[in-house]
Amino acid sequence: MNEAILKTTDASAILCDASIAAQVGDDWFDPAHWQAGLVAGGRGSAWRVQTPAGAAVLRHYRRGGALARLLGDRYWWQRAELTRPFAEFRLLQRLQALRLPVPEPLAARYRRVGVFYRADLLTRLIADAETLAQRIAGRRVDAATMQRVGATVARFHAARVWHADLNAHNVLLVDVPERASLAVRDEATTRVHLIDFDRSELRAPAGDWPEQNLARLRRSLLKLGAAADGEYEFDTTLWQPLRAGYSAARQQIDTDAAAAAGPPP
């Protein structure tokens, strides 16, 4: 991960990876500049773009909930480090340093508009990915995939990461061929990534926030029709495997941490 570089103008500021600092400018945050295609999933507006730094996703921040109608894409200005894109950029940098499966942050920008600001974030595209929501809609999710989703969420929780909007649209799945030694054919495994860390943060390990996070994910799955064949079927074939993967991963992480710490003095 390269050092982040801050570039400022009269009304805006850009925080970017040092490797692209000489190239990135305000035009990088204009979808029309890239003739971009809309990307499904997550909050706000997102476009798939091809930049000199490679394929990326450009996201324009938009409010949700009751304030969306009143303020749209405007946020109250306080100071630069508290802006949505700068906070998310820094968090993604930290999560990448922890080797967690998140998009690589490329550049973040805010633009001052009176007492408000508007914001954008550019992250590297995770190629060949589908959202968990898309898999649910196509009824293409099995127990093994849900176990991997649970195990991945467990890694974030063990690292004290609270995801502000953990839902099926913000879980990306990538099928990767995995060749077993001496095997005649390839078998596919699924890699799981989490995206959209707007308002997310590192929290103290104590508390019930991990269970609240999981409950939010469960509600999103039910809202998407994952229990179309009945909630018992959903629990048995999808949710229980997710919980099993989560529990097994947490236990393994705790065991590894205890072994690394060594015996008590």
Spans of model-derived segments:
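Conserved active-site beta-strand-loop modules that form the wall/rim of enzyme catalytic pockets
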Residues: 117-124, 162, 169, 190-193
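Conserved kinase catalytic-core helix
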Residues: 91-101, 132-169
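Juxta-kinase regulatory segment immediately upstream of eukaryotic protein kinase catalytic domains
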Residues: 1-36
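Charged catalytic carboxylate motif
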Residues: 87, 148, 216
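Conserved ATP-binding subdomain of kinase catalytic cores across diverse folds
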Residues: 23-130, 154, 158
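C-lobe/activation-segment region of protein kinase-like
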Residues: 186-265
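Conserved protein kinase catalytic/activation segment
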Residues: 170-195
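Short glycine-biased active-site loop of nucleotidyltransferases that positions the nucleotide triphosphate
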Residues: 113-115, 183-184, 206
